[in-house]
């Protein structure tokens, strides 16, 4: 089942409050994903379909943890709201570059706008780790070095657990 929460709205599911927040990037649908006749005309016209506004999410868990999921975004003054209204203690920040924040921009958003206690690096569009370690020279490493708070790296088979203050009980 799907539950609709439009941009700016909130819903509660299973005790978790989910708010939709602004993300900033284009959000087109490539004609290859559309019906044949429509796709043909769109390709000929050089246009893509509009998939609606980009969004991020703020989750408030039953243990009190507030987590910000950036979605694909660029730097925006709206990131201030994540700190001032929602007071997020954990962030999952996409750092893909090219069509989202790169490492420097993502670090700015975290250090100067959102200011969480911890951040999880996400969606870097690269193999950011090898054998469980951050790859030297990667975007993931650049973000980790620039961020002023602990950056947790998601690894296959590893579970991370955060308390209400955004502190990870992770074995690093």
Regions inferred by a protein language model and the residue ranges of each:
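Active-site metal-binding motif and surrounding structural segment of the metallo-beta-lactamase
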Residues: 1-4, 84-92
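Binuclear metal-ion centers of metallo-dependent hydrolases, dominated by the metallo-beta-lactamase
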Residues: 2-10, 107-172
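Core dinuclear metal-dependent hydrolase active-site scaffold
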Residues: 5-84, 156-172
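Divalent metal-coordination and catalytic microenvironments
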Residues: 18, 72, 91, 119, ...
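Catalytic metal-binding/acid-base residues of hydrolase active sites
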Residues: 24, 74, 96-98, 125
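Alpha-helical scaffolding within the catalytic cores
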Residues: 75-79, 102-109
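Acidic-and-aromatic substrate-binding clefts and catalytic sites of carbohydrate-active enzymes
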Residues: 97-102, 128-131
